[in-house]
Amino acid sequence: MSKKTSPSMDSWLKEAKAHESAPKIGMYLTHNGIVRKSAKAKVRQGAADTRPVVGMQFSYNQEAVDAIIAETYKLDGIFYIKVWLNEGKLSVGDDIMYVLIGGDIRPHVVDALQYLVRRIKNECVTEIELY
């Protein structure tokens, strides 16, 4: 499995603004997760004895992602969602995930983005850091 070509956020936004839901949307918010050099244990738990990351083996469960997207649409004020996930062996700086979410007002969109990304990261993906 090899990594994918990253999407164009400009194209995504153009598509979203042409979608039938666009008249209800007052805000679009994007997320672009990338492979970083600092190990997850260092960033999240403050572990001092971690080696630099040189890459990541990344995979995901598409059915689980689709189910979480469907649940996110049930949140207040959310009318548009698009998600792209990479796969395979990734290098530092490579894109892992893109999310575009559109909704009526900022609090709804910010909360929905956090909900969606957290659930995808915690329930749908496998990230193996390479050293």
Where are these regions (language model features)?
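N-terminal, polar/charged subdomain of small-to-medium soluble alpha/beta proteins
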Residues: 1-95, 102-105, 110-131
